[in-house]
Amino acid sequence: MAPASSEEDLRPSKPKVIYVMGAGRSGSTILGVALGNCDGIFFAGELDKWLPRAGEPTRKDAARVAFWERVRARMGDPEILVGARPRRYLERSSALFRVDRLRALARLRAPYREATSELFAAIAATAGADYVVDSSHYPLRAHELQSLAEIELYLVLLVRSPQSVIASFAKDDVAERRFSPVTTRA
């Protein structure tokens, strides 16, 4: 058997994706960081936001920007998918009730699946990881990921009491949008 020519040749052809589902503020970031500290695992965060942000990281430190630039360079041009439409039509639970958008959904599904497969492969190759952790939470996104033959998918469902999830939205020590208990109907 000939030796592998590069480190990339040693990785499996299919990236292994650990997809974390559950309510926001259920512990997915803590789980992702813990897994990301293990050899061969890269915590990518909530990848459902990658296309709407055109692959631009929200934090602009040099190492992070350089990493995501290398990821984008490994991918094709997902121009049709940039923006919020794929997320609204394919990933969000409310998409199930948007029967008026079935044509748009059908038109977006194939490029969405191709870009998503490319994204996981590009992240795994750039990070030198066998596993990519995506903590996007959405069950419909998990459903779309299950249809991708190019990845090996593992699902994790985090469960936290509804009262604790709602209480966490009222905290002011988190750099995300806050909701009051009245807004969340608690």
Functional labels for PLM-detected ranges:
Residues 44-132:
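PAPS-dependent sulfation machinery
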Residues 20-32:
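Glycine-rich phosphate-binding P-loop
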Residues 1-17:
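Extreme N-terminal, non-catalytic leader segments
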Residues 37, 43, 49, 164:
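Active-site micro-motifs of SAM-dependent methyltransferase domains
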Residues 120-186:
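PAPS-dependent sulfotransferase catalytic domain
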Residues 29-41:
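A conserved segment at the C-terminal end of the G1
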Residues 18, 42, 154-157:
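Hydrophobic/aromatic beta-strand patches that form the interior of the parallel beta-sheet core
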Residues 13, 24, 109-112, 134-138:
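Aromatic-acidic/polar surface patches that form glycan- and anion
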